[in-house]
Every structure is written in structure tokens, then in C-alpha cells.
């Protein structure tokens, strides 16, 4: 070819064609669609994600569980005795081993080696491995703030000695690590219970909550990263779920399995999966939640967060929490005002919170996310992020943040012994529920004081008017107490388009117990709801209202093909 320009043009064209072929090949060569990732360990992740790995180290996730050794054990094992309900236990060292001398499964005192520790703040728990492979969590725990031993008694039996054959005894099934705790404290847990020998051979990839608990197993991601391709895989993306997707559902539902009260629908959940394909959250049932949806029992945060306006608006966990340290992203009211950037001075001023700046009452979370103490020393905040409602407290007996704070302050100031008998608001509420007249009177008195204060603050305002409107607390309270207006109130909750799905599902469950023609029609209609939790709960509860099996099958059969496993399972049952 004599024309140099033509030669150059051909060379450029050929290079372009070859580059295009190479790029197309690079794109088309993909990992098979059915390939499934395996766990590679956090040390592998750290090679490329060093900053995130170091942020995670020392976090509550990193220290969720550990082997008991000099670096992890916080409790005093220097031959220290602790007595509770007539049982004297002794914590001591045997060389490098941490030991406890306490009542065993047969009721006699014996020595047990502490093999594992749980957590570090505000308490640390200790675990013993029994000969059959069962790992049991001791009720004697270490208060890491007060630096003392305490007995973590079950909330409903605070003053009883637990017999060795009681399921709540530390050797019983309710304190069994494999059944009650393990999958949320370790990564890739395999319980491995052998039915023939009735023994456990439990294994995990990593002892703590590591990278792959939240991001999913990383082998495909590592394989793709090491391939140095110009593209991520056309089948598997970058080999991990996209938790930063615009839809907050993917992130929230990756946290939910371990931060919710739920039961399993199907095994082997992996991050990025649909929560309701693997779990069903507990509804706002009596004993778990107060009638207005505030947390009561140890329900964690997912169920309350589902009720919040924040969830409805797309707020996600990492808007407030650093995902690696788990710490809050901002201190004080900046946590809220970093998003609620309304005209200056609208919220973080006495005109809004009516308290001295810098005091507890001036903190957003104290009013809108009150804490309830669990395990005696562990305060956990309600994530429904609601306005305090002393009016509902007076009317229905539900708690409110104002009464909680002021009642605890009064008990400390008076020092009449109430602060020992009821160290926290939740303890006073529980005492009142058990029939303690003094607790009931004290709570009622402060409730009325708080109602009077808020009525004065918000007289003739929009908030004053809004609080006269029905709240789903009225419906759930009426249903729990069997009041005649329950059906009407529940129907209004179900028909309200702004009702959070978890509340709607709870109302459906109550309507099924009423068993009238109108309530049955509403349950049938709810089987077509856009929310799968509502659909699944409706199916399960329709059976209570359908004496005719043929009618029931006709109504339920189409939902055997529902895209969500929880709904299909409910239909099959």
C-alpha cells in the first residue's frame, strides 16, 4: 500500500476493530449466572478495603463474640463470689482458663470453663460449652460500666429461683446459644445438629459479625476484582449486593435479620435478598409492643422503624449510623438537624423543645426516640421516631417520653427507695401491669402533669388539633381489650392509606378474631394488598374465618404463585 495516509487509516481502523472485539469479549465473558459466592474471610477484604476494615475493628460487630482470653474478658475472675436466689457462684482462673463454679444442669454445683464472651458494652456475657456441643449463655453477667457482676434474670420472673429443669435456667433451651443467639453474633453459622446423637457440631466462618455478614460472601467479588477487567460482570455486577441502591429496602433488609424480632420462613438468607423470602417480623402483638406500637419486649429496632415516617420517606440505617464503626454519624442534635435543615431555630431551640438548652429534655432523641432498658443495663431506643403523646397515656395507659424522663428524675430526687424498686420507667410500667398500686398511681400522676404541660405549650396550634385525631393505638387497644368499637376502629386503620404495613397487618390479625361478615370481607380484600406482609398475614388469618374449606382454597390458591416466599408459605399452610 503506497499511500501512507491510507495505510495509517487502515491501521487505525484495524486497531479500532481489534479494540472493539477485545472490549466486547471482555464484556461478554461472564461468570455463569448460577454461580454462588463462597465466604473468603475479612482478612481477604482488608487487602483492598483497609480503611473500612480498620474502622470495623473494635466495633460492636467485631466484638459481638470472641474466645475467652486475657484480651477479651472484662469481668473479675479473681476468685470472686456472687450470690443470687440462694445460689453462690464463684468466678476464678485455672491457669489460662476462665472458670465459674455454679449450679449445673443437674442442680449440683460444679466447675465450668468459660469458652466464649459476648459483647463488651454496656455488659459482657459468658458462655459455657457442654459435652454434647451445646453452648449455654450464663445469666451471671458483667456490668462493664459499673464494673460489677449482676444476674440477668428473665423480665417476667425477676424474683424467682429458676430450677435446673426450667427452660429459662442458664442450662435450658432459652439460654442455648445455637438456638437463640448464634446466627446474629457470628458469620456464616452452621448449627450442625445431629438428630441421631442429639449433639451439636457447630461451625462458623468467623467468630464475630464480619464483612461478609453484611455484604454477603465475597469470592465472586474477589475473582472479578483480580481479573482486572474493564467491566464488572454482566450477570453478577461487582459480585456483591448493592446496598447503596436508591431503594433503601436493600440496605435496611440486610440489617433487619439481626435487628428484628422475627421467625424464620426459609434458611440461608444472604444480604441483598428479600427479607420476607426468609423471615417474617413479629407484629405489634400484646406483650411485645405497647398498644401504640412503642417497644415493650426485646423486639430490637426493625419493627418500630417500620412504623416511622422516616422509613416511609426512604431514610436508611446508614443515614444515622456509620456502617463500620456502628457509631452515630453526628453528636447531639446534629444527628437530626443534619437532615432537618429547616429555617434556623425551628427545632433546636426552647420554643420547640421547651427545655433548658443542653439538658436531656432538649435532645431530640430523648423526646422522639425514648430508650427502654433491656438486660437490666442496656438502653435501646425506640425507632418509630414519634411525638410524645401524654394524652394517649392518660386515655390508654401507653408510655410517653415525657413521663419516663420526669418519673425517673423524681424517683432519684425523692430517694424513697422507688429508684431501687423501679430503677427505670419500664420497671415502673411493668410493676403497674402486675398490679402494683403505688406504681400505677405514680405513673398516672405524672401522666396528667405532662398532659397539662403539653396542652399549655400547644394550645390552639396545629399539633393540638392533630392529636385529637384517631391514632392506631385506639384500635389496637380496643382489640386487645375486646371493646365493642374495636371492629370499626380496626377497619378505619386498614382503610387508611397512610397506615404503615406492619400496623395494617396487625389490624388484619385482630379483625380475623372478630369474625364478622364485614371483617372477613376486609381480610379477603387485604389478600390483594400491595405489601407482601399484609398479604401473607391476611391469608393466614382468613382460615379462622372460613369454615368452608372449598371457599378457602379458592380464595388462597392464586397466592401460591406470589413472588414473595412468606406469602406463598402462608398460602400453602
Show which residues each predicted segment covers.
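Amphipathic alpha-helical scaffolding segments comprising HEAT/armadillo-like alpha-solenoid repeats
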Residues: 483-495, 516-528, 546-560
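Conserved hydrophobic register position within alpha-solenoid helical repeats
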Residues: 507, 538, 571-572
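Hydrophobic membrane-insertion alpha-helices, especially the h-region
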Residues: 9-23
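Local sequence-structure signature of Cys/Sec-based thiol-disulfide redox active-site neighborhoods
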Residues: 36-47
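Primarily the internal scaffold of c-type cytochrome electron-transfer domains
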Residues: 26-29, 43, 51-119, 123-130, ...
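Short inter-helical turns and helix N-cap capping residues of alpha-solenoid HEAT/ARM repeat scaffolds
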Residues: 497-500, 530-532, 563-564
Amino acid at each position: 500500500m503506497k499511500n501512507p495516509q491510507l495505510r495509517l487509516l487502515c491501521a487505525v481502523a484495524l486497531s479500532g476493530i481489534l479494540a472493539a472485539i477485545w472490549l466486547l469479549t471482555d464484556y461478554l465473558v461472564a461468570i455463569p449466572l448460577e454461580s454462588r459466592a463462597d465466604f473468603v474471610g475479612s482478612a481477604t477484604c482488608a487487602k483492598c478495603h483497609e480503611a473500612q476494615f480498620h474502622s470495623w475493628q473494635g466495633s460492636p460487630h467485631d466484638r459481638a463474640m470472641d474466645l475467652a482470653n486475657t484480651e477479651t474478658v472484662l469481668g473479675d475472675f479473681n476468685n470472686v463470689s456472687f450470690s443470687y436466689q440462694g445460689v453462690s457462684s464463684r468466678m476464678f482462673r485455672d491457669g489460662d482458663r476462665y472458670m465459674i463454679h455454679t449450679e449445673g444442669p443437674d442442680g449440683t454445683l460444679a466447675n465450668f470453663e468459660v469458652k466464649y464472651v459476648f459483647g463488651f458494652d454496656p455488659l459482657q456475657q459468658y458462655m459455657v460449652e457442654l459435652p454434647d456441643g451445646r453452648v449455654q449463655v450464663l445469666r451471671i453477667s458483667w456490668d462493664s460500666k459499673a464494673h460489677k457482676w449482676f444476674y440477668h434474670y428473665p423480665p417476667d420472673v425477676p424474683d424467682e429461683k429458676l430450677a435446673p429443669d426450667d427452660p429459662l435456667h442458664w442450662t435450658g433451651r432459652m439460654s442455648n446459644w445455637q438456638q437463640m443467639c448464634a446466627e446474629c453474633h457470628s458469620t456464616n453459622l452452621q448449627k450442625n445438629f445431629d438428630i441421631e446423637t442429639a449433639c451439636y457440631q457447630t461451625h462458623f466462618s468467623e467468630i464475630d459479625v464480619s464483612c461478609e455478614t453484611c455484604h454477603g460472601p465475597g469470592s465472586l467479588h474477589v475473582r472479578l476484582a483480580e481479573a482486572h477487567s474493564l467491566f464488572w460482570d454482566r450477570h453478577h455486577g461487582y459480585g456483591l449486593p448493592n446496598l447503596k441502591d436508591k431503594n433503601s429496602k436493600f440496605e435496611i433488609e440486610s440489617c433487619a435479620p439481626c435487628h428484628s424480632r422475627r421467625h424464620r420462613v426459609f434458611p440461608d438468607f444472604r444480604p441483598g435478598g428479600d427479607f420476607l423470602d426468609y423471615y417474617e417480623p413479629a407484629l405489634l402483638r400484646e406483650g411485645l409492643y405497647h398498644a401504640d406500637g412503642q417497644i415493650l419486649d426485646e423486639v430490637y429496632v426493625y419493627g418500630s422503624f417500620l412504623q416511622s415516617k422516616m422509613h416511609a420517606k426512604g431514610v436508611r440505617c446508614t443515614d444515622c449510623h456509620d456502617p463500620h464503626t456502628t457509631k452515630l454519624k453526628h453528636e447531639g442534635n446534629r444527628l437530626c438537624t443534619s437532615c432537618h435543615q429547616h429555617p434556623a431555630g425551628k427545632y433546636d431551640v426552647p420554643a420547640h423543645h421547651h427545655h433548658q438548652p443542653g439538658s436531656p429534655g432538649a435532645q431530640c432523641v430523648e423526646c422522639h426516640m425514648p430508650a427502654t432498658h433491656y438486660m437490666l443495663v442496656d438502653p435501646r431506643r425506640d425507632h418509630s421516631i414519634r411525638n410524645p403523646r401524654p394524652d394517649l397515656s392518660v386515655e390508654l395507659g401507653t408510655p410517653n417520653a415525657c413521663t419516663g424522663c420526669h418519673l425517673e428524675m423524681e424517683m432519684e430526687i425523692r430517694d424513697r427507695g422507688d429508684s431501687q424498686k423501679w430503677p427505670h420507667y419500664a420497671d415502673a410500667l411493668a410493676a403497674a401491669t402486675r398490679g402494683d398500686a403505688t406504681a400505677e398511681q405514680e405513673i398516672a400522676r405524672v401522666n396528667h402533669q405532662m398532659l397539662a404541660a403539653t396542652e399549655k405549650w400547644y394550645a390552639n396550634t396545629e399539633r393540638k388539633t392533630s392529636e385529637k385525631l384517631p391514632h392506631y393505638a385506639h384500635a389496637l387497644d380496643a382489640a386487645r381489650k375486646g371493646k365493642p368499637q374495636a371492629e370499626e376502629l380496626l377497619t378505619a386503620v386498614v382503610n387508611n392509606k397512610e397506615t404503615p404495613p406492619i400496623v395494617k397487618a396487625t389490624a388484619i390479625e385482630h379483625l380475623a378474631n372478630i369474625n364478622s361478615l364485614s371483617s372477613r370481607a376486609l381480610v379477603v380484600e387485604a389478600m390483594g394488598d400491595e405489601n407482601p406482609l399484609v398479604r401473607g398475614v391476611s391469608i393466614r388469618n382468613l382460615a379462622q374465618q372460613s369454615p368452608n374449606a372449598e371457599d378457602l382454597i379458592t380464595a388462597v390458591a392464586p397466592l401460591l404463585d406470589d413472588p414473595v416466599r412468606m406469602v406463598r408459605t402462608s398460602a400453602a399452610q
